[in-house]
Amino acid sequence: MQGFSKENFISLKYNANEEIGNQYFKQYNCQSVPHLLFVDSKGNEVDRIIGFLPPTEYLIRIEDIAQKRNTLNDYLARYKKGEISADIIAAIAMKYEDRKENDKAVEFYSILIRDYPDPSSEYYKQGKFFLASHEFISGNENALRFYVSNNPDSPFCFDAYRKMVYHYANSEQREKELSIYSEMLSLFP
C-alpha cells in the first residue's frame, strides 16, 4: 500500500488546526478529520476519502483515484454518455455531498428519489435524509421533524435529531436546542 502511494502520489500532510492546513480545509470544503484530499497538478480535486477505511478498501480506493475511476468526473462522464442508473446517480450525489456542493447533491438525490423510488434501497434512504436535512438548513424548521415522523424506522432518525440540535446550538436558539434534546432523551434513552 505504501509502495503504491509513493509511486502514484505526492503526499503532503497538513494539520487543520494550523494556518495553512486550515486554509486548505476551508478551500476544499472539508468536513471532518481525517480527510484525505487528492488533487491534480493544477490543484483541481480528483477525489477525497473522509474518515478511516479498512486497508483493503483503502487500497482499492486509491487505485481507483490514481486511475481516475469512480471519481466525480468519471461518474459525470458516464452519466452524460447515457450510463444512467440508481448507482451512478447516487454516486454523483454522494460525491457532491462530500464536497459540500449541496445544491448539486440536491439535484441528483432528487433525480434518484423521483426516478428510482425504492424505499428499501440504502441510496434512497440516504437521499431522503439528505433532502430533508437540506430543506431544514435552508429554513424549513419542520423538514427533519416531518422526515422522522414519516420514516420512524430510518437509520437516520438519530442523525436528524442531532442535526437539529447542532443547528440550534450554532444559531444560539437555546430553547429549541433544549427541546430537541428533551425529545431525543425520550426517544433514545
Predicted regions located by residue number:
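Solenoidal tandem-repeat scaffolds enriched in leucines and small polar residues
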Residues: 89, 95-122
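Non-catalytic, surface beta->alpha helical segment in thiol-disulfide oxidoreductase systems
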Residues: 30-71
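Alpha-helical repeat scaffolds
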Residues: 71-78, 103-114, 138-152, 174-186
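TPR-adjacent "capping" and linker segments in tetratricopeptide-repeat scaffold/adaptor proteins
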Residues: 65-88, 151-155
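Short solvent-exposed coil/turn linkers within tandem alpha-helical repeat scaffolds
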Residues: 49-52, 81-83, 99, 114-124, ...
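Structural register within alpha-helical repeat arrays
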Residues: 89-96, 126-131, 147, 163-164
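Thiol-based oxidoreductase modules, predominantly thioredoxin-like and allied folds used
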Residues: 1-20, 32, 38-39
